[in-house]
Amino acid sequence: MDSNKKTARIAGLLYLTVVLTGIFHLMYVPSRLIVWDNASVTFNNILESETLFRLGIVAGIVCYTAFLILPFVLYKLLLQVHKTFAIGMVILAVISVPISLINLLNKVNVLSLIGKAQYLQVIGTDELQAQVLLYLDFYNNGMKIASLFWGLWLLPFGYLVFKSGFLPKLLGIFLMAGCFGYLTNFVGGFLIPNYGDLGISRMISLPASIGEIGICLWLLIIGVRHKQTL
């Protein structure tokens, strides 16, 4: 069990890295720089805070790299619970990583557009600003695809947590519910215009947030227990 506790702590540390860098990359930086209905303001914000924008990209790389390693550590911890579900968990999590990393090229392209390259002088200011916002929109579209797998992996992961006997069943339930929250938002985002502006999208995301932050802290602080927890 000492070995399991060590594995759990490593998983918790990786998960914490994913959570913190993910919040910075996906929430904090965009909230400071991007104004979706104003290309000019967005362009100038990125130009004036280029370092913050670059840090956001680096945070994304760290986040997705940690997320690539995380499921393999969890696999080692949860293999004893159910091998098939553990394998499925790894596959579904790992699929999202190349999608997410390749998608970061859209933000790298934004850096090219705000640069001082000679060839950019032939492009009008308005067109340049519109292209910056277009690449950011491309990035968001890529994140929608990646989010499908961010949700799917939570189902086998939550099931393994629920059945483990050494992790809280309640967190397993939240994780499994989070899967369906992700799927609902994925489908809603494609079928319903301005779905993201609806309050329901944030409410549906809550189980995943509670489950993931909860299991992250549990693994990091407590690790595993000898007896079943509720």
At which residue positions do the language-model features occur?
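Hydrophobic, aromatic-enriched alpha-helical segments typical of multi-pass transmembrane helices
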Residues: 1-230
